[in-house]
Amino acid sequence: MSGAPVSGRYSGLRQRVLTALVLIAALAVVLFALPPAATLALVVVAILVGGWEWSAFVAPTRPALRAAFVALLALGIAAAWPLSGSRSGMLALLVVAGLWWLLAVFWILRGPQRVGAVLAAVAGIASLVPVAVALGRLRLEPGQGAWVLLFALLVIMAADVGAYFAGHRFGRIKLAPSVSPGKTWEGVIGGLLFSLIIAIVGARLLGWPVAVVAPLAVGAAAFSVVGDLMESLMKRHSGLKDSGHLFPGHGGILDRFDSLTAGIPLLTLGLLQAGLVGEGWPP
């Protein structure tokens, strides 16, 4: 056994857990105590903060260009939002997002090769605009928007939690060592299993068919790993360890919620295609 004190071995984990509990409490307040419009505003603010963090991948030493990227991101969200008011428009947006994440898989497989500012900016817009719109539309689901959004968040975040603990306990085979050395296939499998459990429980509570929701959730959770790896890849391109320092033990907005950038749009696409969401969304 190691002679290191228990407090030393688990201090990092304790900090992560405490931060996560605070975030969960804040999420509950945002979803169930605030009106939908306030939730939408906070979603946009959070995405723009994430955009500021992403801008460090674009032009780390040029504040004016970083601010320009955030402004471009805001314009992208503003342009995409009215498009998402119709089923066909939302489907088009989410399909484009899905194609982007498929392309991202091949980019990640190439490993941490440097990219220019323009490509980094395009990747940021493609990653952040769809998740902002999808989160907003899920919250506006008539009757149970807060619960639907909570379900989607928990499914994707469960993949993170399951991967963290399964990877630490059983991790042996590296997933993408040149991009994120700490991630393992065992962790991914553990994350998918935890997402599946959350999806089954959530589907039953929402009155949705488990046979439809479970595979959608697992597929979205699998792609959430791509969102995580994409942020890791961009950090390696930029020589950064964390995207920010907003959350103790978790880094910045992107470090905490990078998996949502891929997982939420693809889960929303599946739920929309299955007819489980999207009826009665306001324009």
Outline where the language-model segments fall.
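Membrane-embedded alpha-helical bundles of polytopic integral membrane proteins
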Residues: S2-G219
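Hydrophobic side chains within alpha-helical segments
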Residues: T19, A56, A163, E231-M234, ...
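Short helical (or helix-break) motifs at transmembrane helix termini and adjacent helical loops
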Residues: A158-H168, S224-R236
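Re-entrant/interfacial helical elements at transmembrane boundaries that shape
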Residues: H168-R169, K235-H237, T261, P265-L266
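Hydrophobic transmembrane alpha-helical segments of multi-pass transport and channel proteins
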Residues: A221-L229, I253-T261
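Interfacial loop-to-transmembrane junctions
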Residues: H237-L260
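Final/C-terminal transmembrane alpha-helix of multipass membrane proteins
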Residues: R256-L272
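Juxtamembrane boundary at the C-terminal end of a transmembrane helix
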Residues: L269-P283
